Structures are given as C-alpha cells and as structure tokens.
Amino acid sequence: MNQTLTPELQKLLTQLSQHLAVAEKPSELNLLSLWSQYKIAKAKLVAATTQKGDWTEVDRVLNYVSPECLEFSTSSATLLLAKLLERYAASTTKKVLLYARAANYWGIEEELLSKNFYSRLFKNIPKSQKDGRTRKCFEKHEIEHILAAFASNEFVSKFSVFPHSHYHGYVQFLALTGFCPEEAIALTWADIKNGRIIVSRAYSQGILKETKTYESRNFPINSQLDKLLNGLPKTQNLVFPSPEGGYINQHNFGERYWKPIVKKLVATGTVGEYLPTYNLRHSWITRMLRANLDIATVAKLAGNKADTIMKHYLAAQVRDLVLPEF
C-alpha cells in the first residue's frame, strides 16, 4: 500500500541523503593532508627533537606554497620544486622534498597513492657547497684498535647510560662492507637472504628513504661478514637497533661514542688521527682497490660511480707509505 510522505518526513529524508552524500565523498588528498597523516603515523618512531625542528619547518613551508603545488601530479611536483627554489636555500628545498618523498612512499604503502612524484626531483636541486669531508682512511691495524675499544668498553664513562659494546657490531659491519652509515642503520633482517645483502634504503635525520643513487644493490656476504651477522641478536627487525630499540641516531652516535673513543686512541698513539665514522667507508674502498679489485666492481659494491671512486676515494696514506725501489 502506497503512503504519502508528510512534508516533515520528506524534509528529514532529504537532509539525511545530503548528509550521507557528504560523508561518502572522499576527502581531497594532497601533499599537505598526506603530510599530516604521515606525522601521526610516525610520531612514536621519530625523535621529539626532529619533530620540533624539521617537522615544524616542513609545516611552515607547505603552508606557505600555493595549493596547486601540493597536488599529486608530475607537473605539481615540478612546480613545487620551482617555488621552493625561488624562496628557500637549496638545503631547505632538499629537506622539504625528502620529507615529501617519505610521506609519498608511506602513502603508497597505505594504498593512498600509486606512485612517488618526488623521487626524481633531487637531480634538479643545485649542489650546495662542499662539506669539507675528508677522504682519508684508517689503516687495518687502526680499525682493529677501534673495534677492540668498542668491544671492551675500555673508555666508557661512568655517566654513560649504555655500554660502548652495544655498537661494536655496527662499527665492525661498516668496516667490513664500506656501507654508508645511514644504509647500515636502515638494514633489516629481511634484507639478508641467500648469501647477499639487499641495499635499498637509508635512514637519516628521522627519514627512511632510498639510497643516494635511488637504486638498490646486492652485496655479497663473505665468511667474515657471515660470522658477524650470525653472532648478532635477532630480537627485532632492525639488524642494528639503538639501545632503546629504534633507529640509531648517527649524529648522537658520532658525538657520544665514536668521537670520544677514537680521540682517546689518538691520544694513546694507537690511531694516527681522528677521522669521522664515514671514513670507514673510504677505508674499505681504498683497501679493496689496494687488494687489486677492479674499480668497476668496487664502485658497484659501494653503490657509486667508477669516476667518483677515482676522484675521491683512492686515498694514499703517505704516513705509512713505503716507496718501491727500482
């Protein structure tokens, strides 16, 4: 039996249908809204100092640019790069795009997006001034002394919350592989399989990102490396977690652990001079070249170009050099 709706009921049904239509309409996703979701998802994993510093800076920049720069398209991403370079330094532009790329990758994992629009923009950012990073390297016996100091907690302060030995495996891994510290920090047990290490990510300044070449590489595991990896605890997914269980903060590690140890070894005469953690990479590359491994192979293993190896990493240690006689 048909019944005529009263005006009041008809009005209620109209209002209900309008409400449902609004509720079912998907919200417009752009970089700013995705960035907000990304921060919520990562808040417990990222240091409070990073959130207060870097995240606040990214907030300020993204709220400044026009809406058309924040849409997910190749043209909008390119426009964003142009607008950032107009107003900000190259270093700030790079930082914002690093976070944009990280948020975009998270969006892909959450099935909110299907591609990353920011990965290929970095080659268009002007190079900043050289960082003054030295390419000198440690000799084999110096690395052995450094590793021994980490393992024995020889120089640990009574005020130190965590022992130096926690980082022994991490330092030994860097010495045996020539990995960038940020690559080792990002390494998970799932990346190690069939006698090889898959290098596809790097963790730096609170961001999990691609390697600096934007390409993954396979690194073979020899007997030394196999022994090290098999001796590490597998209590979580990260191969080299911090004492608290998250990602290692490389800056804090360098200032609180690496620098005090190496400087004390320099003072005792067992290490020739202080060099940063990154120089373990230079040391490995130089050692491979001295062992007559060809440059192309060393470059592939290190995730570098052959001409970069020739230009920057073939370090001559003059203080220990013995000239051949003719």
How would you label these PLM feature ranges?
Residues K44, C137, Y203-Q205, A302-F326:
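Catalytic-site neighborhood detector that most strongly recognizes the C-terminal catalytic loop/helix
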Residues L97, T188, L289, A302, ...:
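DNA major-groove recognition helix of helix-turn-helix
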Residues M1-K25, K212:
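Short, surface-exposed polybasic/aromatic micro-patch for ligand or macromolecular engagement
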Residues F150-H164, T177, F219, K234-L238, ...:
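Short, basic (Lys/Arg/His-rich) helix/loop patches that form interaction surfaces
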Residues Q15-Y88, A103-Y105, K263-K264:
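Basic/aromatic-enriched alpha-helical hairpins
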Residues K123, A186-G231:
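Conserved tyrosine-mediated DNA breakage-rejoining catalytic core shared by Y-recombinases
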Residues K94-V96, E109, L113-K115, S119-P181, ...:
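Basic, Lys/Arg- and aromatic-enriched nucleic-acid-binding interface segment
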